[in-house]
From Swiss-Prot:
Origin organism lineage: Eukaryota, Metazoa, Chordata, Craniata, Vertebrata
This protein's encoding gene: Ankrd52
ANK repeat segments: 7-36, 40-69, 73-102, 106-135, 139-168, 172-201, 205-234, 238-267, 271-301, 305-334, 338-367, 371-400, 422-451, 455-484, 488-545, 549-579, 584-613, 617-646, 651-680, 687-716, 720-749, 753-782, 790-819, 822-852, 857-886, 890-920, 924-953, 960-989
Physiological role: Putative regulatory subunit of protein phosphatase 6 (PP6) that may be involved in the recognition of phosphoprotein substrates.
Alphabetical list of PROSITE patterns matching this protein: ANK_REP_REGION (PS50297), ANK_REPEAT (PS50088)
Sorted UniProt keywords: ANK repeat, Phosphoprotein, Repeat
Subunit structure: Protein phosphatase 6 (PP6) holoenzyme is proposed to be a heterotrimeric complex formed by the catalytic subunit, a SAPS domain-containing subunit (PP6R) and an ankyrin repeat-domain containing regulatory subunit (ARS). Interacts with PPP6R1.
Superkingdom of source: Eukaryota
Name the UniProt record assigns to this protein: Serine/threonine-protein phosphatase 6 regulatory ankyrin repeat subunit C
PANTHER family noted in UniProt: ANK_REP_REGION DOMAIN-CONTAINING PROTEIN-RELATED, PALMITOYLTRANSFERASE HIP14
Chain positions found as Phosphoserine: S1028, S1075
Length: 1076
């Protein structure tokens, strides 16, 4: 706010500023409002504190003035008194309980204000009343920062004596020393250093004291810091030294001092720039550059991008500095990593005078830069005609004819038609740049207007793409072909139709136009682009030409939203309707809708009869506009009669499905309001999903509310019987769920597996949703069993998935529901899926009621935990008195289950901690050792053997008379066989097929019989008993006829034929799977 007129203020304030005590007393006696506010909410007390009249202030305070009143800047009278340096007024305010900690909008206290305004006496009065002198304002500055900033030595000294911290930092980590150095308060700096301040301190960006002093040109501070031993070449966070800073800001006196003190003139920063680079580019760095050059700076030092100081001078056209650099040996054709020389840079930025200097000093005009461009390429690309003229006049190729051979001998310069790495000549660049003067200069110098680049484009293509009317006229007049196609089949007309898109963007500079001027410039360019297109059409450009994808210029205009261009093309094209309605590959209507160009879409909608044409995926333009969320395009299409019920081919989605799935509420509203069908909101896709279901699946609450308000059926089910409520339970969106329940959605609806939303909420762990559903279910059907078709309840699912919050809620809601449904209890589910949290909760809540419960196959939770190798589950179950040797219907204990499944951790725990009984037999008389060997679980078998020396267990036979040794041998468990033999396992025992453990190693019965014959022949019979019972049992089932002989021996006794059964006897008979 500006300066206020005193005559506009209340009489009381006028009397205060007049210092008229009697008038003030008179006004107060007349009940004048003592706390009246001005436009900035200042009270008379603020005015009195500012003026500093103690008697008036006493009158006001005695009359009840608000001592802590705040104005619009939150300044109190105490702040005003401190700013006025009036210690008597400040003392009087303090005596009347003024808040010494009051903060203004910058978080500054009265002490900050006193320090900033050199009010030493005020600061002295305030300091004892504060708990800390280091309180920071909004920028993190303490009172000491402000005192140092003001340069008042006495105040600084006072604050230090009162205990202010020397090294306190603001939010940019700047200490008071930084401000002393920056502002040149040398005496203050000396005082701070004498009190122990750190001379090597740095702020967040690594600026030290020497950097800050150099930045502001504080030469005396710089000299003092150097005398104090400051590191002269210390870099900041960007690698810049104090010399870099001085050169960048043109502080030549500081630069001289630093150089004389031995600063490294060639030290690079993080980007590889030396102080000379910085001096070359800075606004006021001319003297610094001369200083550096005279003191040995390397004029050819290249940055990380390969730029020399001459490159930097060329960027801003520093003519004098470039001359100094050249005179001191700067390489004239030094190339950066892009290949650009200083001449390229000068041409790019249009510095004609510098170009002259460089060329005079021998710069190579034919040197290739970025993309193999000449300097001339860059000059014409950016539209610098004077630079173009200069380069052409001094650098173009010329030749000398030899008088003897009559041959042309190259003398100097470059060929104007030489292409860059992408095949573009200077004429291509000029056409792209849009400067017709450059274009004319090149054409008059012999540039080939029919030359094509690597993409098959002529200069006319580039002129058309940039909407350059004058360049297009010049090129066509000179003979350029208007219908020539590039490698993609695009003619200049295609590019002109989309010219706003292809136009080269202008770089924004400090002197850029404001928004209004920018808009005028854009409008001017749009008009020029339109004239360019019109000119091409008038000069024979064929609008029916298609590119290699089948697109015409109409397609391009629609895709890039150029309404005027589109209207012109539709008007000029003889077969416009055929082009517009063609869906090969995509119609213009689809392109405009997909890209959200509503104006172009409106033009097409007014031209077409049928707006429901579909692309190869069956999508209409309305579908694309809806999917992309272009509400304006949706509005245009629906207003012109486009159907919202046409389905795409894959998922059979309509535009309504697309809008709901993407959350485009406004588009969805327009589609529903089109009134195409009464039940439009319940249209289904290929899976039976309605828009409401998709909106809920993606959590779009606004769409859900809209669909329900417009009549969408809340209980509609898809092909699997799942409703919107099922989906809300899965996603956990409480707002969506509440909306459905408000519209009477049925809570206990079941899908094809009998699962309700309550099941799904429990499985997904959405506690808040589950609570809401349970409350709704009570009012719907309190007697519903709540189990699915497999007998599983929500409690089963919560336990299985480990969602303890949901389980706790279910236990509170229905503590006996664990008895309902499948006998494979929630505890079974928790332990088999390694869910410790829900296991612990179930055991804590139900304990003995559930710990030994059995499923349909007689298995306890301990069996399930063993099967899943869940050691923590086993531990918790045993702690709650689970029966370690309980058997299922097949007679197996938890240990046997673990052994058969190969769960080594469970076997180890049950053996060592659970002390499980190893002698228990199942229905086929298998022990845990039999089962471990039968499945090849070597580690489990060895663990069991390590716990027993019982020969009865080691030689125990099952119903097929097989010992563990038989089974281990048959499965190739060498270490188990060795352990069994070392513990006394018999090798002569035979199973029901007459096989010893050795013969059990055979892969099948026939091999075993052959092996038995060979063994019987190799070992002679004892003399007293030629045919022992062992040999008889060994051979009785060999299957060889008695009449046959072996190796000349007689027929074997009892050699009756016995056909071998391919199926072994069911000695093991394990089901091996816990999956339900």
């Amino acid at each position: 706010m500006g300066i206020l007129s005193i005559t506009d203020q209340p009489p009381l304030v006028q009397a205060i500023f007049s210092r008229d005590v009697e008038e003030v007393r008179s006004l107060l006696s007349q009940k004048e409002n003592i706390n009246v506010l001005d436009q900035e909410r200042r009270t008379p007390l603020h005015a009195a504190a500012y003026v500093g009249d103690v008697p008036i202030l006493q009158l006001l305070l005695m009359s009840g003035a608000n001592v802590n009143a705040k104005d619009t800047l939150w300044l109190t009278p105490l702040h005003r008194a401190a700013a006025s340096r009036n210690e008597k007024v400040l003392g009087l305010l303090l005596a009347h309980s003024a808040d010494v900690n009051a903060r203004d909008k910058l978080w500054q206290t009265p002490l900050h204000v006193a320090a900033a305004n050199r009010a030493t006496k005020c600061a002295e009065a305030l300091a004892p009343l504060l708990s800390s002198l280091n309180v920071a304002d909004r920028s993190g500055r303490s009172a000491l920062h402000h005192a140092v900033h003001s340069g008042h030595l006495e105040t600084v000294n006072l604050l230090l004596n009162k205990g202010a911290s020397l090294n306190v930092c603001d939010k940019k980590e700047r200490q008071p020393l930084h401000w002393a150095a920056f502002l040149g308060h040398l005496e203050v700096l000396k005082l701070l250093v004498a009190r122990g301040a750190d001379l090597s301190c740095k702020d967040r960006k690594g600026y030290g004291l020497l950097h800050t002093a150099a930045a502001s040109g504080q030469i005396e501070v710089v000299k003092h810091l150097l005398r104090m031993g400051a590191e002269i070449d210390e870099p900041n966070a960007f690698g810049n030294t104090a010399l870099h800073i001085a050169c960048y800001l043109g502080q030549d006196a500081v630069a001289i001092e630093l150089v004389n003190a031995g600063a490294n003139v060639n030290q690079p920063n993080d980007k590889g720039f030396t102080p000379l680079h910085v001096a070359a580019v800075s606004t006021n760095g001319a003297l610094c550059l001369e200083l550096l050059v005279n003191n040995g700076a390397d004029v050819n030092y290249q940055s990380k991008e390969g730029k020399s100081p001459l490159h930097m001078a060329a960027i801003h056209g520093r003519f004098t500095r470039s001359q100094i650099l050249i005179q001191n040996g700067s390489e004239i054709d030094c190339a950066d990593k892009f290949g650009n020389t200083p001449l390229h840079v000068a041409a790019r930025y249009g510095h004609e005078l510098l170009i002259s200097t460089l060329m005079t000093n021998g710069a190579d005009t034919a040197r290739r830069g970025i993309h193999d461009m000449f300097p001339l390429h860059l000059a014409v690309l950016f539209g610098f005609s004077d630079c173009c003229r200069k380069l052409l006049s001094s650098g173009q190729l010329y030749s000398i004819v030899s008088s003897l051979s009559n041959e042309h001998v190259l003398s100097a310069g470059f060929d104007i038609n030489t292409p860059d790495s992408l095949g573009r000549t200077c004429l291509h660049a000029a056409a792209s740049g849009g400067n017709v003067e450059c274009l004319n200069l090149l054409l008059s110098s012999g540039a080939d207007l029919r030359r094509r680049d690597k993409f098959g484009r002529t200069p006319l293509h580039y002129a058309a793409a940039n909407g350059s009317y004058q360049c297009a006229v010049t090129l066509v007049t000179a003979g350029a072909g208007v219908n020539e196609a590039d490698c993609k089949g695009c003619s200049p007309l295609h590019y002109a139709a989309a010219s706003d898109t292809y136009r080269r963007a202008e770089p924004h500079t400090a002197s850029s136009h404001d928004a209004e001027e920018d808009e005028l410039l854009k409008e001017s360019r749009r008009k020029e682009a339109f004239f360019c297109l019109e000119f091409l059409l008038d000069n024979g450009a064929d609008p029916s030409l298609r590119d290699r994808q089948g697109y015409t210029a109409v397609h391009y205009a629609a895709a890039y939203g150029n309404r005027q261009n589109l209207e012109l093309l539709l008007e000029m094209s003889f077969n416009c309707l055929e082009d517009v309605e063609s869906t090969v590959p995509v119609s213009p209507l689809h392109l405009a809708a997909y890209n959200g160009h509503c104006e172009a879409l409106k033009t097409l909608a007014e031209t077409l009869v049928n707006l429901d044409v579909r692309d190869h995926k069956g999508r209409t333009a309305l579908f694309l506009a809806t999917e992309r969320g272009s509400t304006e395009c949706v509005e245009v299409l629906t207003a012109h009669g486009a159907s919202a019920l046409i389905k795409e081919r894959k998922r059979k989605w309509t535009p309504l499905h697309a809008a709901a799935a993407s959350g485009h509420t406004d588009s969805l509203h327009l589609l529903i309001d089109s009134g195409e069908r009464a039940d439009i909101t319940d249209v289904m896709d290929a899976y039976g999903q309605t828009p409401l279901m998709l909106a809920i699946m993606n959590g779009h609450v606004d769409c859900v509310h809209l669909l329900l308000e417009k009549g969408s059926t809340a209980d509609a089910a898809d092909l699997r019987g799942r409703t919107a409520l099922h989906r809300g339970a899965v996603t956990g969106c409480e707002d969506c769920l509440a909306a459905l329940l408000d519209h009477d959605a049925f809570v206990l609806c079941r899908d094809f597996k009998g699962r309700t939303p309550i099941h799904l909420a429990s499985a997904c762990g959405h506690t808040a949703v589950l609570r809401t559903l349970l409350q709704a279910a009570l009012s719907t059907d309190p007697l519903d069993a709540g189990v699915d078709y497999s007998g599983y309840s929500p409690m089963h699912w919560a336990s299985y998935t480990g969602h303890e919050d949901c389980l706790e809620l279910l236990l509170e809601h229905s503590p006996f529901s664990y008895l309902e449904g499948n006998p494979f209890t929630p505890l079974h589910c928790a332990v088999i899926n390694n869910q410790d949290s829900t296991t612990e909760m179930l055991l804590g809540a139900l304990g003995a009621k559930i710990v030994n419960s059995r499923d349909a196959k007689g298995r306890t939770p301990l069996h399930a935990a063993a099967f899943a190798d869940n050691v923590s589950g086993l531990r918790m179950l045993l702690q709650h008195q689970a029966e370690v040797n309980a058997t299922d219907h097949t007679g197996r204990t938890a240990l046997m289950t673990a052994a058969e499944s190969g769960q080594t951790a469970a076997v180890e725990f049950l053996l060592y901690r659970g002390k499980a009984d190893l002698t228990v037999l199942d229905e086929n008389k298998n022990t845990a050792l039999h089962l471990a060997c039968s499945k090849g679980h070597e580690k489990c078998a060895l663990m069991i053997l390590a716990e027993t020396q019982d020969l009865g267990l080691i030689n125990a036979t099952n119903s097929a008379l097989q010992m563990p040794l038989h089974i281990a041998a048959r499965n190739g468990l060498a270490s188990v066989v060795q352990a069994l033999l070392s513990r006394g396992a018999t090798v002569l025992a035979v199973d029901e097929e007459g096989h010893t453990p050795a013969l059990a190693c055979a892969p099948n019965k026939d091999v075993a019989d052959c092996l038995a014959l060979i063994l019987s022949t190799m070992k002679p019979f004892p003399p007293k008993d030629a045919v022992s019972p062992f040999s008889f049992s060994l051979l009785k089932n060999c299957g060889i006829a008695a009449a046959k002989t072996v190796g000349g021996c007689g027929a074997l006794p009892h050699g009756a034929s016995c056909p071998y059964s391919q199926e072994r006897h069911g000695a093991i008979g394990l089901d091996g799977c816990y999956s339900e």
